């Protein structure tokens, strides 16, 4: 499928379109004409209508939310937060990219809520990474909370813990020192915790 004109400079959009095209073709056997039309749409009102109309497929809502988000339209916020917490990590990556571009002041609070929701711990990786990228006041407290939980014996979500360790090192806040020191004996997190401790300010 030819890339829609005007978006080739956005590799994340191109990657999303390729992924969704394969997904739709695998599920439906062919690509509906509406897919190409939506991929080329830039009108914010048309995109918002697609985002809010009942019965729209997930691929259409994802394209519309992404387009609105990177254009700075706050009407994309709720849809992008839902996609950030999706079980499909590729959708989460795309949503996180759009949320950063959106720069909505609600994003950090929403990401912190998703990251610290223990019932969704398996899907917290992208919210954790987003918090580190945002460098918001909510970032360090949320990452500390999540990492403390991931240090429990037998916890299966060590990749989330690793993202917390790396994020806290990137943020460089000395408030993270205690939890990073607690992570040093962890067999999967210890080396990363050592590196992050070296990055802390103060």
Where are these regions (language model features)?
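Amphipathic alpha-helical scaffolding segments comprising HEAT/armadillo-like alpha-solenoid repeats
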Residues: 4-18, 39-53, 73-85, 104-117, ...
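Residue-level detector of extended alpha-helical repeat arrays and alpha-solenoid scaffolds
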Residues: 28-31, 61, 92, 124, ...
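HEAT-repeat alpha-solenoid elements in large eukaryotic scaffold proteins
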Residues: 17-28
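Extended alpha-helical scaffolding segments
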Residues: 157-183
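Core register positions within helices of long alpha-helical scaffolds
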Residues: 34-37, 67, 98-101, 130, ...
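Short inter-helical turns and helix N-cap capping residues of alpha-solenoid HEAT/ARM repeat scaffolds
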Residues: 55-57, 87-88, 119-120, 157, ...
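Conserved hydrophobic register position within alpha-solenoid helical repeats
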Residues: 31-34, 64, 95, 127, ...
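Alpha-helical segment of the N-proximal tetratricopeptide repeat
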Residues: 28-40, 49, 56, 60-70
């Amino acid at each position: 499928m030819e890339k829609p004109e005007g978006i080739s400079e956005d590799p994340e959009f191109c990657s999303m379109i390729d992924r969704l095209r394969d997904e739709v073709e695998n599920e439906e056997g062919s690509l509906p004409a509406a897919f190409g039309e939506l991929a080329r749409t830039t009108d914010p009102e048309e995109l918002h209508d697609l985002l809010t109309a009942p019965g729209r497929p997930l691929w259409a809502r994802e394209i519309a939310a992404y387009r609105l988000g990177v254009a700075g339209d706050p009407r994309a916020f709720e849809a992008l937060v839902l996609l950030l917490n999706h079980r499909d990590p590729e959708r989460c990556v795309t949503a996180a990219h759009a949320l950063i571009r959106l720069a909505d002041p609600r994003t950090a609070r929403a990401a912190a809520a998703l990251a610290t929701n223990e019932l969704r711990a398996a899907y917290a990786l992208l919210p954790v990474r987003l918090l580190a990228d945002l460098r918001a006041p909510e970032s360090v407290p949320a990452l500390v909370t999540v990492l403390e939980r991931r240090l429990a014996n037998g916890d299966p979500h060590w990749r989330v813990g690793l993202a917390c360790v790396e994020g806290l090192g990137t943020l460089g806040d000395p408030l993270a020192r205690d939890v990073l020191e607690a992570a040093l004996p962890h067999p999967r997190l210890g080396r990363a915790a050592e590196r992050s401790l070296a990055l802390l300010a103060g």
